[in-house]
Design a protein with these regions (language model features):
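Transmembrane alpha-helix interface/packing and boundary motifs in multi-pass membrane proteins
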Residues: 22-40, 120
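Short amphipathic helix-loop junctions that connect adjacent transmembrane helices
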Residues: 40-48
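Transmembrane alpha-helical segments of integral membrane proteins
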Residues: 156-169
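Membrane-interfacial helix-loop-helix
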Residues: 1-22, 49-132, 136-139, 143, ...
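Residue-level signal for transmembrane alpha-helical positions in Major Facilitator Superfamily
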Residues: 35, 39, 127, 158, ...
């Protein structure tokens, strides 16, 4: 399955160039099985061999990232904080989440929205998800777009640049991104475990 997906991704970039990169990155933001660690390094390789430029690939990928982020932002914003609060009030107990927990999370995001979006766009697995709380909190659109773009430029430049440098060995980028993903998953698991332990201690 993943092999077929990788082949399709490469075929799209071969046929459409920078436009294909932009479209794939839009899809990658809203459809996680499309992996940026394949899209972006391969785009760098294609540019390195002369079919386009590295700069064009970075610009295209960044435009795609912003458009994809806006899709998730728009969906979350259409739900809004009131509906989310009502959902937590009704069903939060099934997830061990109380309205007070949601309020604290919202307050934290409101204080750190810019940093969360900017840095979140540079972190595997978090890159797309960070658009959701931004939408729920209806973060002002201009800062959201600007800092989504800035964070995406960092990520896109790193992976496309690596692909261009490695050339036909661009696939070597993927294992390093995989390690970062494992680290992120481990951190998330630890945070969830800490949250669960804290909740249990409060009930005891």
């Amino acid at each position: 399955m993943l092999g077929d997906l990788a082949t399709w991704v490469q075929d799209v970039i071969e046929r459409l160039g920078a436009v294909g990169v932009a479209l794939l990155v839009v899809l990658e933001n809203v459809f996680p099985p499309i992996p940026s660690e394949i899209v972006l390094p391969f785009a760098g390789f294609v540019a390195q061999r002369g079919d386009g430029s590295v700069l064009a690939m970075i610009v295209a990928a960044t435009i795609g990232a912003v458009v994809g982020a806006l899709v998730l932002y728009g969906i979350a914003a259409s739900i809004g904080p009131v509906r989310l609060s009502h959902f937590i009030e009704r069903f939060g107990r099934w997830f061990g989440v109380k309205p007070a927990d949601l309020a604290r999370a919202e307050a934290w995001f409101d204080r750190h929205a810019v940093a969360a979006v900017l840095l979140g766009r540079c972190v595997p697995l978090i890159r797309s998800v960070v658009s959701v709380p931004a939408g729920f909190r209806r973060m002002r659109l201009a800062p959201f777009v600007v800092f989504t773009a800035l964070g995406s430029v960092v990520w896109n430049t790193a992976l496309i640049g690596a692909g261009a440098i490695l050339g036909d060995q661009w696939e070597k980028v993927e294992p390093y991104v995989a390690v970062l993903q494992y680290v992120v998953v481990a951190v998330i698991v630890l945070l969830v475990a800490r949250f669960a332990v804290t909740k249990l201690r409060r009930r005891a």
